[in-house]
Amino acid sequence: MKKILLIASMTAGLTACASSPAPEEDSRLKEAYSACINTAQGSPEKIEACQSVLNVLKKERRHQQFANEESVRVLDYQQCIQATRTGNDQAVKADCDKVWQEIRSHNNVQ
């Protein structure tokens, strides 16, 4: 009986050790994305580079929803910037600023 309890406790301990690096890595990816967004300062080229981190996050099941939502926001922002280059700068700039603030607010490093 003691052997069974010992084996069960060792298995539980090893399982806990084996699964702890994954959440740590996940949080590092989200932190990397947040840092990328925070340093992008609205630059479409820099934001495009952040997309590669989102692509990795999309592969992680627990981050798929976040990554998909952020991808939409980033694409919205890039389209918005493109619209300012081709159309009425002033009218579109306010919309771009709103989208950018939304991206920033979702990516504040806590």
From Swiss-Prot:
The keyword Signal applies. It is a lipid-anchor. GO terms for cellular component: plasma membrane. A lipid is attached at residue 17 (S-diacylglycerol cysteine). It holds the Pfam family YbfN. It comes from the Bacteria. PROSITE patterns: PROKAR_LIPOPROTEIN (PS51257). Induction: In the absence of chitobiose, expression of chiPQ is silenced by the ChiX small regulatory RNA (sRNA), which sequesters the ribosome binding site of the chiPQ mRNA by an antisense mechanism. In the presence of chitosugars, the chbBCARFG chitobiose operon is induced and acts as an RNA trap to degrade the constitutively expressed ChiX, leading to the translation of chiPQ. Chitobiose and chitotriose also induce chiP mRNA synthesis. ChiQ appears dispensable for growth on either chitobiose or chitotriose. This is Uncharacterized lipoprotein ChiQ.
